[in-house]
Every structure is written in structure tokens, then in C-alpha cells.
UniProtKB/Swiss-Prot annotation:
InterPro entries: Unkempt-like, Znf_CCCH, Znf_CCCH_sf. This is Zinc finger CCCH domain-containing protein 61. The keyword DNA-binding applies. The lineage of its organism: Eukaryota, Viridiplantae, Streptophyta, Embryophyta, Tracheophyta. It comes from Arabidopsis thaliana (Mouse-ear cress). Pfam families: zf-CCCH (PF00642), zf-CCCH_AtC3H23 (PF25512). It comes from the Eukaryota. It is found in: Cytoplasm, Stress granule; Cytoplasm, P-body. The gene is TZF5.
Length: 381
């Protein structure tokens, strides 16, 4: 440092000499040059957070720009340290805003390392497309927490970094205009099934009543509706019973015999009854049983004591009916044989003839074995 003395006696300020070499080196020092790529390289030793000031560590960049935007650098550099995509790089991703695919791994790509459908595939190709997809990125917590040393971590390291997806699949993912997973083929199919199940579950008779995803505004079957349903059933049962009783009241003896003759269980006894009644009505002037009907004492006593035993057993046939059954006359089902046609006296005559026949045979059956046709008259009057 040189000190100059003026003629007046005053001392001037000291002059400091600095070599030009140091000025040039300080101006061109790497610490004075600031660039995003340099900051990215300096911060590669620790995991990036959304809380940091690095623009390459934000959620939006990671989901929609990382390994998607083309790198513009002309010099050769390490692709693993660059956040942009390069030609032929395996970590290259498809833009989820342009290509609609889900966060599920493509089975064909995982087996063979390539997919025949290419960019049109509806599934993720590779780890970066799978875990950086808007439907999966930072939706789970990192097992290492704040001590994570990964360059690019797909998981959250704090509660503030944890991304909570909207509950409705039809809403778009925050940060992208077309990054909704609901537009993929698989999700569209699942949404259609969900809507179908939702519509079907609103039906009162549906088995999917308890499988509805969204609760309905009102219960599917209120107590008032249950009471109405039971009242409708009660009214229906009463109407059926009334109809059955009226049909039984209007049923004549001939119609009952005709209906019972078609059943294999009651065929023998009903056919014998029809034949006997037809012959008795045609010969009521003679007041005698037909000569071809041979009724023994024992068989008649068994028939009068238990008339339902033969009707309820399909294998048991009275002895007097073996080989003696004949088809009823063609006019048996005519109007002249219906009790409503005015031939009620035929039944009285037949009853009187049967009583006289029992008297002629001179056997005692007892009070319980007498033929009582009074209930027939009660039904017909």
C-alpha cells in the first residue's frame, strides 16, 4: 500500500492494489452461477419435499411434468439426475392428462417388459407411471419418514404431504384438467356397475338392498308401508276364503262325485257310488237294489262303519267291486240328475230302498252303522 504526500502537507487516502487474476477468478467462480439444474444436483443427496423451495419437488411437477417434458439440454449428462425425459429412456412417462390410464401395473408389461398396445394401454407401464400417477402419488406414508434419503420418493413424509383423494371418482384430481382415473376403460366399467347396483338397490324387492354405497334419504320400507303390505295380504286372504266357501256352497253332489272320480285315490269308491245312485234313481218305482250289485253282510257292515277307509287308501278296494265295475251311463252327468234340476226325490227314494234292503237281509249293524243321508238334504236345501 502506497501513501502519497502532497505539497500542502496533507496525507491522501491509501490505495490498495488488487491483481486482475483474483478479480477474474472471483467473477467466474461456480458459486456465483445459479441455475435450476445446479440446485437440483446439489439437493440430490436428500429427499425432496413439497415444503422446500425447489420447483422440481412440488406435487404438480412430479405428477404431470417429471420424466414427461422433453429435456432441452444439448450436452451429454446423467439421465438419472435430470428430472426431464430423454429419447429411449425407460423411466419415460405418459402424460396422464393426455393418455387415460390407471395406476395399476400392466400385467403384460410386467412379464415381458413391453406392451403390445403401447401408449393406448389403460394400465401403467413401469414404476414411475404407477407410483407417480395422480391417483397414487403420496397417498401412503413413507416407512422411513423424515429420514428418507431417496432422490425421488413416491410417499409422504409428513401429514401435510399426505394427499387425500376426493371420495367421488367422478371428480378430477387436483392439479390436472384431465387426470381423472374415472375416464379409463376399467374405471368407466366399474362406474357403470356401481350405478346399476345403485339403481337396483332402490327396488323394495331387490337383494342388493343392503349393498348400496350411498345411504338413501328415506328408509326403503317404512313402518307404514309394512302395515299396508300386511293389510293387503289380510284382505287377499279373506277374499280367497270367501271365494272358497261360496264355491263349496254352490257345489252339487253330482259335481263333487265327478271331480272325485278323476282322482286315482278315490276312483273305486266314487265310481261305485255313482253307479249305485244311477241305478237306484232309474229303478225307484220298484224300490229294490240292482240285481248285479252283490252286497254281502260283512262288506256292507265295514262300508257303513268306516266309509272313509276305502276312499283314503288307493290299494284297498271293496270285495264287491272286483270285476263288477261298469262305466256310468252317458246321461248320468246330464241336467236330469243334478239336484238343482228338481230330482231331489230320487235321493229320498234311494235312501228308502237301501233301508228296506237292510231290513230284508235281517242283520244288525247298530246305531252307528245306519245310513244317514240327512246331511245330503241339508247341503242341497
Amino acid at each position: 500500500m502506497d501513501v502519497e504526500h502532497h505539497k500542502s502537507g496533507h496525507i491522501s487516502r491509501p490505495t490498495v492494489d488488487i491483481p486482475p487474476r483474483k478479480l477474474l477468478s472471483s467473477a467466474k467462480s461456480p458459486s456465483s452461477v445459479s441455475s435450476p439444474l445446479r440446485d437440483y444436483k446439489e439437493q440430490k443427496d436428500y429427499c425432496y419435499d413439497s415444503d422446500s423451495e425447489d420447483p422440481y419437488a412440488g406435487d404438480h411437477f412430479r405428477m404431470y411434468e417429471f420424466k414427461i417434458r422433453r429435456c432441452t439440454r444439448s450436452r451429454s449428462h446423467d439421465w438419472t439426475d435430470c428430472p426431464f425425459s430423454h429419447p429411449g429412456e425407460k423411466a419415460r412417462r405418459r402424460d396422464p392428462r393426455r393418455f387415460h390410464y390407471t395406476g395399476e401395473v400392466c400385467p403384460e408389461f410386467s412379464r415381458h417388459g413391453d406392451c403390445s398396445r403401447g401408449d393406448e394401454c389403460g394400465f401403467a407401464h413401469g414404476v414411475f407411471e404407477c407410483w407417480l400417477h395422480p391417483s397414487r402419488y403420496r397417498t401412503e406414508a413413507c416407512k422411513d419418514g423424515k429420514h428418507c434419503k431417496r432422490k425421488v420418493c413416491f410417499f409422504a413424509h409428513s401429514p401435510r404431504q399426505l394427499r387425500v383423494l376426493p371420495p367421488s371418482p367422478e371428480n378430477h384430481i387436483s392439479g390436472g384438467c384431465g387426470g381423472s382415473p374415472s375416464s379409463s376403460p376399467a374405471s368407466v366399467l366399474s362406474n357403470k356397475n356401481n350405478r346399476c347396483c345403485l339403481f337396483c338397490s332402490h327396488s323394495p324387492t331387490s337383494t342388493l338392498l343392503n349393498l348400496s354405497r350411498s345411504p338413501s334419504s328415506s328408509p326403503p320400507l317404512s313402518p307404514a308401508d309394512k302395515a299396508d303390505a300386511f293389510s293387503r295380504l289380510s284382505r287377499r286372504r279373506t277374499a280367497v276364503l270367501n271365494e272358497l266357501i261360496s264355491s263349496l256352497d254352490s257345489l252339487s253332489l253330482t259335481e263333487a262325485l265327478a271331480a272325485s272320480s278323476s282322482s286315482p285315490v278315490t276312483m273305486p269308491i266314487s265310481t261305485a257310488t255313482m253307479i249305485a245312485s244311477s241305478n237306484l234313481s232309474s229303478n225307484h218305482h220298484h224300490h229294490r237294489l240292482p240285481p248285479w250289485l252283490d252286497v254281502g253282510d260283512r262288506d256292507l257292515q265295514l262300508q257303513q262303519s268306516s266309509p272313509l277307509r276305502f276312499a283314503l287308501s288307493p290299494s284297498s278296494t271293496p270285495s264287491y267291486l272286483h270285476g263288477q265295475l261298469q262305466p256310468p251311463p252317458s246321461s248320468f252327468f246330464g241336467d236330469e240328475f243334478t239336484p238343482r234340476g228338481g230330482r231331489l226325490s230320487d235321493f229320498s227314494v234311494a235312501a228308502a230302498a237301501a233301508a228296506q234292503a237292510r231290513d230284508k237281509n235281517s242283520f244288525e249293524v247298530g246305531s252307528s252303522g245306519d245310513l244317514d243321508l240327512g246331511w245330503v238334504n241339508d247341503l242341497l236345501t
